[in-house]
């Protein structure tokens, strides 16, 4: 029935995808779109910087985990959101139509303010 698209597969988008897939019946499609094919647990970055952890211990490939739960995954940067037509244009030229859109791309920090 409905196609729910979530932009961003970080600490907001990934759990949102899991929850939606769990709560909605299989007639609905849930798709996560993320510029990278990996999840990085950002709170662990200081541990990596100090040498307490390796990068491989704080990142993992998203696709196998999402697809195991019935969530579609597109590893591609979104260029534009065409809200009037419910479409997302991706960096590779593909277009993804949606019925509902969740934007969970994280903050843009303003260090210069």
Language-model region placement:
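Beta1-alpha1 glycine-rich phosphate/pyrophosphate-binding loop at the start
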Residues: 2-72
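FAD-binding core/adjacent interface of flavoenzyme oxidoreductases
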Residues: 1, 71-113
């Amino acid at each position: 029935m409905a196609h729910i698209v979530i932009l961003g597969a970080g600490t907001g988008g990934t759990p949102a995808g899991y929850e939606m897939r769990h709560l909605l019946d299989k007639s609905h499609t849930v798709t996560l779109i993320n510029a990278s094919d990996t999840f990085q647990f950002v709170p662990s970055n200081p541990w990596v910087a100090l040498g307490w952890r390796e990068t491989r211990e704080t990142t993992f490939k998203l696709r196998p985990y999402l697809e195991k739960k019935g969530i579609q995954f597109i590893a591609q940067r979104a260029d534009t959101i065409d809200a009037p037509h419910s479409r997302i244009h991706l960096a590779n030229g593909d277009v993804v139509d949606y019925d509902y859109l969740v934007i969970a791309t994280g903050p843009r920090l303003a260090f210069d303010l």
